[in-house]
Amino acid sequence: MNFKYIVAVSFLLASAYARSEENDEQSLSQRDVLEEESLREIRGIGTKILGGVKTALKGALKELASTYANGKRTAEEHEVMKRLEAVMRDLDSLDYPEEAAERETRSFNQEEIANLFTKKEKRILGPVISTIGGVLGGLLKNLG
């Protein structure tokens, strides 16, 4: 009788342990899905903000380019135009950053994806913003 009791208790403990392991795996996979969804939402918001900023900058840069396109230019103004053209190309390359990031990082885990996306944004946006600042500073200096 004691042997049957020990076997029954052992079976109950083993099944309870198996259920808890299964629940842990399910909660981990649900957490991974939620983290992935939140990363996609953050990327979507960032893409929308970046798109708005990009559109505004493109409009401002086109306006500046059109003012310099008419008439004779000095060597300094020619250099400013070259910088503006480079900035325009960089902004055009940012059209689909989310798709590019997903395509490049399919094999990485979620933390590596977030880090890579942030590094890529900094790598692209840093020079673009500094170039725009330099160009606008030079223009204001020339106009003033």
From Swiss-Prot:
Expression by tissue: Expressed by the skin glands.
UniProt KW Signal keyword: yes
Subcellular location: Secreted
Signal peptide: 1-18
Pro-sequence residue ranges: 19-43, 74-123
Source species, domain of life: Eukaryota
Chief localisation class: secreted
Modified residues (Asparagine amide): N70
Pfam families: Bombinin (PF05298)
SS bond partners: none
Site (Important for flexibility): G59
GO biological process: defense response to bacterium; defense response to fungus; killing of cells of another organism
One GO cellular component term noted in the UniProt record for this chain: extracellular region
PTM-bearing positions, type Leucine amide: L143
Coiled coil ranges: none
Alphabetically ordered keywords of this record: Amidation, Amphibian defense peptide, Antibiotic, Antimicrobial, Cleavage on pair of basic residues, Cytolysis, Fungicide, Secreted, Signal, Toxin
Assigned protein family: Belongs to the bombinin family.
Protein's UniProt name: Maximins 1/H1
Originating organism: Bombina maxima (Giant fire-bellied toad)
